[in-house]
């Protein structure tokens, strides 16, 4: 069974860094893995993306090639099925959206852990399979397989009013490793749609972080730029997921397109010396 880089870092008390993709193109995962070793995992935000079971297998292969862990974000109605298939494809962490109750939280843990007595990290319902994670038929049903399910990282979204109201009881469910506050959904659930900076939203986020840290659960924060991490680091947060592929591309196309249109519609100016133009052209390909 493949070592779980994210689990190893969590158990060692080390900080972790991930990034999000909505694309199922495996090359993106390889590029992230080749980005200087800075990323511990890739979150495939499947809640918002179209994908097939074959896509999950191919992403799993790319994760192995890149030497990084994979996390998948799944929607509420698909907890068990998508978690099971993603882990079988080679993902080693599952982020569960829309948790509201203790029973929801128990369902999240059960969708990941092995159905065997004595689990270190919560009750499970997952059985033996013949999938990529076990080499199809090489390690299925082995003690190493059950241990790998026990090591899979279970993450829940705290993003609903009901979840925040039940937060203490939810976080006491055995087997939850990490929490992620979702300001957009939470603001909607309290009637402040789109107002992520509302005082009640900030209060709920702080409550989530403090409640998690109190229990030894790891709070994770999603950011777009490194400069946003500082206030959270001061609170004790060590786990971040930075950037989304769609956001990176959208921002590039918008800003670069705007700049180019400005250049193309600007009044003609005196051309630069030939040597300078040639140098600029060469720089493009460096």
Model feature map: region roles:
Residues 2-4, 244-248, 252-286:
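Extended, intrinsically disordered, low-complexity segments
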Residues 29-35, 72, 77-92, 96, ...:
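Catalytic cores of alpha/beta
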Residues 91-104, 179-188, 238-256:
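Glycine-rich phosphate-binding active-site loops on the catalytic face of alpha/beta enzymes
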Residues 93-174, 269-283:
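Conserved anion-binding
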Residues 19, 45, 94, 108, ...:
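Conserved, mostly hydrophobic/aromatic
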Residues 1-70, 76-77, 154, 172-175:
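Conserved N-terminal beta1-alpha1 strand-loop-helix module at the mouth
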Residues 1-20, 135-151, 206-207, 213-214, ...:
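N-terminal amphipathic alpha-helix/helix-capping segment at the start of soluble metabolic enzymes
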Residues 53-80, 84, 112-118, 146-149, ...:
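Alpha-helix-loop-beta-strand connector modules within alpha/beta enzyme cores
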